[in-house]
Amino acid sequence: MIRLNVFIRTTATNREETVATAKELVAASLKDAGCVAYDLFESATRPDVLMICETWSDAKALAAHETTSHFTTLVPRLNELGELKLEKFVI
């Protein structure tokens, strides 16, 4: 399995749209084949930080997810709204 922790740092101005966009990505991604988990967390200590935790069954499922229309549309939008940092783990 593969685990991705994606940290999103945004601004107060962009926060509402960032959360809405991330929620849209989560809802669509949960339907992708091989998605074990896909969750959005809002930091309790830093209002400018969100985290998406993704778990994929394997590299093939993750690669397929990265070609979906929701990924290719919403991830670039999240990049416009904030700064993304990705940590990838193999379970």
Spans of features found by a protein language model:
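Generic structural signal for secondary-structure transition and capping sites
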Residues: 27-30, 34, 61, 83-86
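Short conserved AdoMet
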Residues: 30, 57, 79
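Acidic-histidine catalytic/liganding microenvironments
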Residues: 32-33, 46, 68, 81
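Short, well-ordered beta-strand segments in beta-rich or mixed alpha/beta enzyme
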Residues: 2-9, 39-66
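Residue-level signal for well-ordered alpha-helical positions
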Residues: 21, 41, 65-68, 77
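Glycine-rich beta-strand-turn "strand-cap" elements at beta-sheet edges
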Residues: 2, 40-48, 73-91
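Generic alpha-helical hydrophobic packing signal
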Residues: 7-9, 22-25, 84, 88-90
